[in-house]
Regions:
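Compact, well-ordered interaction domains used in eukaryotic information-processing assemblies
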Residues: 67-110
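Long protein-protein interaction modules used by eukaryotic assembly/scaffold proteins
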Residues: 2-3, 14, 30-47, 53-56, ...
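N-terminal low-complexity, intrinsically disordered segments
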Residues: 19-77, 86
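Alpha-helical interaction segments
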Residues: 8-12, 65, 91, 126
Length: 154
């Protein structure tokens, strides 16, 4: 068995355990597990680099992403078009280093392992999708018009 096949089998096992543990808890606990605040925005797109900002609950995270791999637009496109029961991984590159992502959707919930949360977290998919779209639109508006958007962080 080749290395890629083994990695996929391990990922499938891991996600099976994660989704089973989510399914096994009571509805109240599921609501608690998906109750996070989340935001995303593009801070800048420069020559060869994209700068993005994430907030999960009270933790803020900034990334500089190289154009040598998938970028912010790929994250937005993939995040907002994830089908039910679909899982995907991708990597953002920095020099040096990389940021690995895992997105797994089941029905109306998404499980995310991000560079800032290796243990993963759950969100209601529509909430996540709306925050990603909003961050993309505000970021583009800010960069190309220099307009301050109401409610935007300083």
């Amino acid at each position: 068995m080749n290395k890629e096949k083994r990695k996929q089998i391990e990922l499938d096992k891991k996600l099976s355990r994660i989704w089973q543990s989510y399914k096994d808890v009571k509805k109240e606990k599921q609501l608690e597990l998906t109750n996070h605040s989340f935001s995303f925005r593009i801070d800048n797109i420069g020559a060869g680099w994209e700068y993005v900002h994430f907030v999960l609950d009270d933790q803020s995270h900034d990334f500089r992403i190289s154009y040598i791999g998938p970028g912010v637009s790929d994250f937005v496109r993939y995040s907002t078009h994830l089908e039910k029961n679909e899982t995907g991984t991708f990597t953002w590159y920095d020099e040096p280093g990389e940021y690995n992502w895992l997105l797994s959707r089941r029905d109306d919930v998404i499980y995310i392992e991000a560079p800032f949360c290796k243990n993963g977290f759950f969100l209601i998919y529509d909430y996540f999708k709306d925050r990603v779209n909003e961050g993309w639109e505000i970021g583009i508006l800010r960069m190309y018009t220099n307009i301050k958007v109401t409610g935007e962080d300083e």
